[in-house]
Amino acid sequence: DDITLKQVAVNSSNLMEGMCIKGVLGHFFFESHGIDLTKEDAILNNIELSDTHVQVMLADTTETPKDTTDTALNWKVTLHTLKLKNVSVDLQMPLDSMGLKAHIGNAEIADAAADLKHQFYGWRKFLLTGTSVNYDTGGPGSAIGFDPSHIALHDIRMGIDSVMYYGRDMNAVIREFSMYERSGLSVTSLTGRLFADSTVIRIPSLKLLTPHSEMNL
């Protein structure tokens, strides 16, 4: 019913053409009390991942053959709890000098569901804290002020609850969002709600605060 892995070293070497994965998996815990392969139904009770750091190198320039198979995916997955702590991913693409790094301090998802047959997705609660993202492309060094080729976000905090996506319908509650960028650009607070269907998108009670401005919709 559960799997635990601790201090696992990962090195894909040459097993995957055009891709190399290296890293350390500090602690991984997986608990499930209901996976039915026949009915394509899975209940994932608890997933925890911590102290994990992975580097991904992409160098594949070959064209992937088009998949012409037609296999229906009817899986229905229910996830009760997912927790991440001190997890980082370093994505490098040397052939086009692009790099993307992300570090997650803490992240938690509660009561998530995905129904692939009916294209229904959602979760009750999502919280992300202590997170940073760095994006770099082109040569080294960055311009003064905001540089879209060298973006460095830190102290990202995000809380999005009551998310539902079904067909063209979407609901979400932006409970909190804040972040800072190395250039000085920052979002002190962003809150609001989102409703959308095939004809309209509404964002009532949207409130954006920065250190020097405020916007309400």
Question: What are the language-model segments listed below?
Answer:
Residues D1-L217:
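N-terminal targeting/secretion presequences
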